[in-house]
């Protein structure tokens, strides 16, 4: 791998960069920091790659909601946890779907499948505001459609089993739920930044499967920890889609938690990556 180069996509935006790979990328002097994405990029609107990226986000989030909501309903329908896949199975469904969908869509849209991930990458200037807003809209629409198809196939069961809607469990306060969502999303978005870091990818020869695997595993672990508290949101589109289709008061009572928490967690992860891990503000001064 000595002396070779490859195109490395930064985060999940459309700006490739030519970087050395393997042993030739070990030195900081061999790495060039990619330019920040522009805030507004009207030219994207005329590009098919822009529109197909949004379609990929829509389909991925649609499939994500369809599989995961069905899994949650299957567990709730069982007479006891031993008769179903249980919390571990739900966590595997969420983590496994993220692993598969990020792997499938990373080369097209970056494989966000989550408004919090998109927001964090936008704050780190990995993609434009134009693309970020478009992604979030398509993710939410995909989530609504995914939950809607589940309800269309099983209307009675969907309403009786809660429709996979996120709520704060009895015995926990709104503060506890908010904290769980903030920290859970921080873990996820921090993992996304680390797994898609252009410098690390260049140094490690950018093996494609290395990014989806830790991201999916992070989702799995966060679900194990926070399902008993909030049912695990960490994805505003997932929470919104289930809440809209279920459409009961208890699904909306604490719905703000599943937007505010993930966005705060994503913002903290973006700041931590940019300021502490990459020290970009300090590099620009020197």
Swiss-Prot record:
Residues 1-34 are annotated as: Disordered. Keywords: Acetylation, Cell membrane, Membrane, Phosphoprotein, Repeat, Transmembrane, Transmembrane helix, Transport. Residues 76-81, 154-174, 230-256 are extracellular. It is found in: Cell membrane. The chain crosses the membrane at residues 55-75, 82-102, 133-153, 175-195, 209-229, 257-277. GO terms for molecular function: channel activity. NCBIfam families: MIP. Aquaporins contain two tandem repeats each containing three membrane-spanning domains and a pore-forming loop with the signature motif Asn-Pro-Ala (NPA). Water channel required to facilitate the transport of water across cell membrane. Essential for the water permeability of the plasma membrane and for the morphology of the root system. Its function is impaired by Hg(2+). Inhibited by cytosolic acidosis which occurs during anoxia in roots. This is Aquaporin PIP1-2. It comes from Arabidopsis thaliana (Mouse-ear cress).
């Amino acid at each position: 791998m000595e002396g070779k180069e490859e195109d490395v996509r930064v985060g999940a935006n459309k700006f490739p960069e030519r970087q050395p790979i393997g042993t030739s990328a070990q030195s900081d002097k061999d790495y060039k920091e990619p330019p920040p994405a522009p805030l507004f990029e009207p030219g994207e609107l005329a590009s098919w790659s822009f529109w197909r990226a949004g379609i990929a986000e829509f389909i991925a989030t649609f499939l994500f909601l369809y599989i995961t909501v069905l899994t949650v309903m299957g567990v709730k329908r069982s007479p006891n946890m031993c008769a179903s896949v249980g919390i571990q199975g739900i966590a595997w469904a969420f983590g496994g779907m993220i692993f598969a969908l990020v792997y499938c869509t990373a080369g097209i849209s970056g494989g966000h499948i989550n408004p919090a991930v998109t927001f964090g990458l936008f704050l780190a200037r990995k993609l434009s505001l134009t693309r970020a807003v478009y992604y979030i809209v398509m993710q939410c629409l995909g989530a609504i459609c995914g939950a809607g198809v589940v309800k269309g196939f099983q209307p009675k069961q969907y309403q009786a089993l809660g429709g996979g809607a996120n709520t704060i469990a009895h015995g926990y306060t709104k503060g506890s739920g908010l904290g769980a969502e903030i920290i859970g999303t921080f873990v996820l978005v921090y993992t996304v930044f680390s797994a898609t870091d252009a410098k690390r990818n260049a140094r490690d020869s950018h093996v494609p499967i290395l990014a989806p695997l830790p991201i999916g595993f992070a989702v799995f672990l966060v679900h194990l920890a926070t399902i008993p508290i909030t049912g695990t949101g960490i994805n505003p589109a997932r929470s919104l889609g289930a809440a809209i289709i279920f459409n009961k008061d208890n699904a909306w009572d604490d719905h703000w938690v599943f937007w505010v928490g993930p966005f705060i967690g994503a913002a903290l992860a973006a700041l931590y990556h940019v300021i502490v891990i990459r020290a970009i503000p300090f590099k620009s001064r020197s």
